[in-house]
C-alpha cells in the first residue's frame, strides 16, 4: 500500500515509517518514540496504537504481533486482496490530530471512492478502550441519517479544515480504480493516508436500501461480479 501511494501522490502523504520486519522480536523498542503504531500488512484490525511506551508490556506486544503473522487472513472471509501476501509488520509514527478519541488516537476518515470520485465519507472515532462512534457524510458534509451498529458522534461534527484537500487526495489515490476505500487522517500539516481497502467489512456490511442503491449506481464495472 505504501509503495502504491508513494508512486501515486508522493511519500509526503504517508506517516513516517520507523521499521519493517517479519519478526516482531527484531523491533528495537528503545529507539522508538514514546508514541507509535504497530500494524500488519495482511489483514484487518491487526494494529496496536501505543500512546505511552513506558506503560506497555513488550513481550505481550511481541506475542500479539506474532499472533497476527500466524493468521492467513485471506482465508478467513475469502478476501482475495489478502491472499498470498508476504506478511510483515510496520512500525509507523503516531499521527497527531485535533479529531481524536479520549486516548488521543486520531479519527479515521474513510472515503468511499468510485472511479476517482468520492461518494461517501465514514468518520470513525474511538479505539478500545474508548467507545467507538461512527458518523457518515456526503462529500458536501451533509450527514447521512443512518447508523451501522455504532452510535454516532455526540452532536454535529465540524468538517475538518482540510476537507477539500482530503477529498482531492482520496480521489487522486483512487483514480482509475473502480472502487476503493481510502482512509485518511486530518493533521495540522495536511491529510495523511492510513489504509486502502478494496473490501470494507469483507463485503458484508448491510447498508440501508437507499444508500446501498446510491453506492451501487456509482460502481461501474465492465463485467458483472
Where are these regions (language model features)?
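Phosphate-binding site of ATP-dependent enzymes
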Residues: 32, 55-149
Amino acid at each position: 500500500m505504501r509503495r502504491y501511494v508513494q508512486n501515486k501522490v508522493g511519500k509526503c502523504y504517508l506517516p513516517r515509517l520507523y521499521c519493517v520486519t517479519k519478526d516482531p522480536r527484531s523491533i528495537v523498542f528503545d529507539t522508538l518514540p514514546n508514541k507509535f503504531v504497530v500494524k500488519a500488512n495482511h489483514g484487518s484490525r491487526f494494529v496496536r496504537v501505543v500512546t505511552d511506551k513506558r506503560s506497555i508490556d513488550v513481550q505481550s506486544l511481541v506475542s500479539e504481533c506474532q499472533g497476527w503473522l500466524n493468521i492467513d487472513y485471506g482465508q478467513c472471509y475469502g478476501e482475495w486482496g489478502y491472499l498470498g501476501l508476504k506478511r510483515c509488520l510496520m512500525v509507523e509514527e503516531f499521527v497527531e490530530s485535533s479529531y481524536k478519541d479520549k486516548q488521543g488516537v486520531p479519527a479515521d476518515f474513510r472515503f468511499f471512492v468510485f472511479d476517482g470520485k468520492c461518494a461517501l465519507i465514514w468518520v470513525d472515532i474511538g479505539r478500545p478502550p474508548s467507545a467507538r462512534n461512527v458518523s457518515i457524510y456526503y462529500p458536501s458534509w451533509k450527514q447521512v441519517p443512518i447508523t451501522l451498529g455504532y452510535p454516532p458522534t455526540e452532536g454535529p461534527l465540524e468538517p475538518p479544515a482540510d476537507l477539500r484537500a482530503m477529498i482531492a487526495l482520496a480521489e487522486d489515490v483512487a483514480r482509475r480504480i473502480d472502487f476503493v476505500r481510502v482512509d485518511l487522517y486530518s493533521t495540522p500539516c495536511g491529510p495523511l493516508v492510513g489504509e486502502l481497502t478494496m473490501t470494507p467489512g469483507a463485503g458484508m456490511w448491510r447498508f440501508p436500501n437507499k444508500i446501498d442503491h446510491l453506492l451501487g449506481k456509482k460502481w461501474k464495472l465492465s463485467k458483472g461480479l
